UniProtKB/Swiss-Prot annotation:
GO molecular function annotation: ATP binding; four-way junction DNA binding; four-way junction helicase activity
Chain spans, region Domain II: 65-142
UniProt-recorded name of the protein: Holliday junction branch migration complex subunit RuvA
GO cellular component: cytoplasm; Holliday junction helicase complex; Holliday junction resolvase complex
Alphabetized InterPro entries for the sequence: DNA_helicase_Holl-junc_RuvA_I, NA-bd_OB-fold, RuvA, RuvA_2-like, RuvA_C, RuvA_C_sf
Similarity field: Belongs to the RuvA family.
Location (main, coarse): cytoplasm
Keywords on record: Cytoplasm, DNA damage, DNA recombination, DNA repair, DNA-binding
UniProt remark on domains: Has three domains with a flexible linker between the domains II and III and assumes an 'L' shape. Domain III is highly mobile and contacts RuvB.
Region (Domain III): 143-190
Length: 190
């Protein structure tokens, strides 16, 4: 297994790059987010997910950060989602957007690229359970904001607390963390 690769980007294609590591060119499939940050000749470090397909061919998938890799791992555990489908989802949605779509039960966020209504519903349902079991820092909810952690430490459900915070932030974008927590407590105690 390969944990990460650091090398020089030799070539860039629609959904993969060729990364030169010690004069060996690796074909690494990446999301559009990764492709946008790639320039030929630049040095890059990618976290690698290795997959051996039905034809016994090894495919490498690369990620700029561990969170995107974790979401890829979660997505491929869902029946009907293979690595290529998962990378296409990650090309369309960031981990934060996936989290938001799951907690708000927005099945339409996943539709397209071969994902119909049924599979989108399965993704939403199965990820709700998986995300609720993740440690807080891995859910990528609000990195610079302690409001969610405060509500969870008070015993509130992670998904309900997140939804309350998102609603408050949408209606009161300039509120301080203290104000957000106060309003969320009021909302959650109703």
């Amino acid at each position: 297994m390969i944990g990460s690769l650091t090398g020089i980007i030799e070539e860039i294609y629609n959904n993969y790059i060729i990364l030169n590591v010690g004069n060996v060119g690796y074909i690494i499939y990446v999301s559009h987010k990764v492709l946008q940050s790639c320039k030929t000749g630049n040095n890059i470090k990618l976290y690698i997910e290795t997959y051996v397909n039905r034809d016994n061919l090894t495919q490498l998938y690369g990620f700029l950060d561990k969170q995107e890799q974790d979401y890829m791992r979660m997505l491929v555990t869902i029946n009907g989602i293979n690595h290529k489908t998962a990378i296409s989802i990650l090309s369309k949605l960031s981990p934060e957007q996936i989290f938001s779509a799951v907690v708000s039960n927005n099945k339409n966020a996943f539709r397209g690229n071969g994902i119909g209504e049924k599979l989108a519903g399965r993704i939403t349902t199965e990820l709700q359970y998986k995300i609720s079991k993740m440690p807080i820092e891995e859910t990528l909810i609000i990195k610079e904001d302690d409001s969610l952690a405060a509500l969870i430490s008070l015993g509130y459900d992670k998904l309900k607390a997140f939804n309350a915070i998102q609603e408050i932030k949408a209606n009161f974008p300039d509120d301080s963390i203290q104000e957000i927590i106060r309003k969320a407590l009021q909302k959650l105690s109703q």
